[in-house]
């Protein structure tokens, strides 16, 4: 939004051109989102408390969680709002990737908001039915995946990049690309949702992964860097650098209030939209495999639920004391802060491993 104003002012003073630089806009986007989050966070929490919009705790969960009952939830609205405002201020409105991310955020944020609203209205831990939730997520994923295919200008954009190997890309074709994108979007959205069970557990991995994706987006969108590093050049993806920076700022601002002991939870409105936009950004820069690596904490949480449910249905026994995985460790007596920090550490290590793929190939 400011780019037009900046270009106009640059006609009178060339110094304004510095605000056109991608790195400058990314820094300003991150700082703006962080500032908005910190300024609005306390007011937002007070409003949630006033209207008694609090977390509903499962009675069959860890007993230590009962004290969290009534903690303000739907904090994902704060993340979504500050993220989108920052992106719209500092982003390039002529870049189609910006609008793909914005629309994805709105679609999955709306699904999550509806789910949270039903839980609060009925004072139950059950929101949307599984079938409706899965159907709406699927429709959203199909729409976004199809949109990405329609704007693809090069066959590279429908190939799967294999990290750590030089010039290795797997042709998917349009159908293969749509199928992969569908599973990445729906899977990532639900994985972050399942992980969001402890204070700050989900948001820090999202921040760390966003940081890595910002680097990959910047390199992929820069012809000289991508050529030197032997990374496929994808024009326009550099704008995702600004978007990732805004997400980092919004995430850090939320973590200020969400860190243990949390003053607010993100709810499904936050987790579903965060997982979805991580997936979409990854798809746009063709780094799906690296998302799987960096997001292994999310993957492990999801697999623990799938394994637990499948095994119980077949043998009427449980493999884990409780699923998702973080609850299993709680049941074993590990403190919540220790679980959270260790999951953060695992994510940080895997993010660094993924970043190593820039040079190791």
From Swiss-Prot:
The protein's topology relative to the membrane is:
Multi-pass membrane protein
Protein's recorded name: Phospho-N-acetylmuramoyl-pentapeptide-transferase
> Where does the UniProt annotation locate this protein?
Cell inner membrane
Does Magnesium appear among the keywords? yes
Question: What GO cellular component entries does it have?
Answer: plasma membrane
Task: Give the EC number(s) under which this enzyme is classified.
Answer: 2.7.8.13
What cofactor(s) does the depicted protein rely on? Mg(2+)
Mind telling me which InterPro entries this protein's record contains?
Answer: Glycosyl_transferase_4, PNAcMuramoyl-5peptid_Trfase, PNAcMuramoyl-5peptid_Trfase_CS
Q: Where is the signal peptide?
A: none
The task this protein performs is described as: Catalyzes the initial step of the lipid cycle reactions in the biosynthesis of the cell wall peptidoglycan: transfers peptidoglycan precursor phospho-MurNAc-pentapeptide from UDP-MurNAc-pentapeptide onto the lipid carrier undecaprenyl phosphate, yielding undecaprenyl-pyrophosphoryl-MurNAc-pentapeptide, known as lipid I.
For whether the record's keyword set contains Cell wall biogenesis/degradation, the answer is yes
Which GO MF terms are attached to this record?
A: metal ion binding; phospho-N-acetylmuramoyl-pentapeptide-transferase activity; UDP-N-acetylmuramoyl-L-alanyl-D-glutamyl-meso-2,6-diaminopimelyl-D-alanyl-D-alanine:undecaprenyl-phosphate transferase activity
Q: Which top class of enzyme applies to this chain?
A: transferase
Q: Which organism is it from?
A: Ruthia magnifica subsp. Calyptogena magnifica
The family annotation for this protein states: Belongs to the glycosyltransferase 4 family. MraY subfamily.
> Which Pfam families does the annotation name?
Glycos_transf_4, MraY_sig1
UniProt keyword annotations, A-Z: Cell cycle, Cell division, Cell inner membrane, Cell membrane, Cell shape, Cell wall biogenesis/degradation, Magnesium, Membrane, Metal-binding, Peptidoglycan synthesis, Transferase, Transmembrane, Transmembrane helix
- Pathway this chain belongs to: Cell wall biogenesis; peptidoglycan biosynthesis
Membrane-spanning intervals of the chain = 26-46, 70-90, 93-113, 131-151, 168-188, 200-220, 237-257, 264-284, 289-309, 338-358
Name a single GO biological process.
Answer: peptidoglycan biosynthetic process
What's the gene?
A: mraY
Q: Mind telling me which PROSITE patterns this protein's record contains?
A: MRAY_1 (PS01347), MRAY_2 (PS01348)
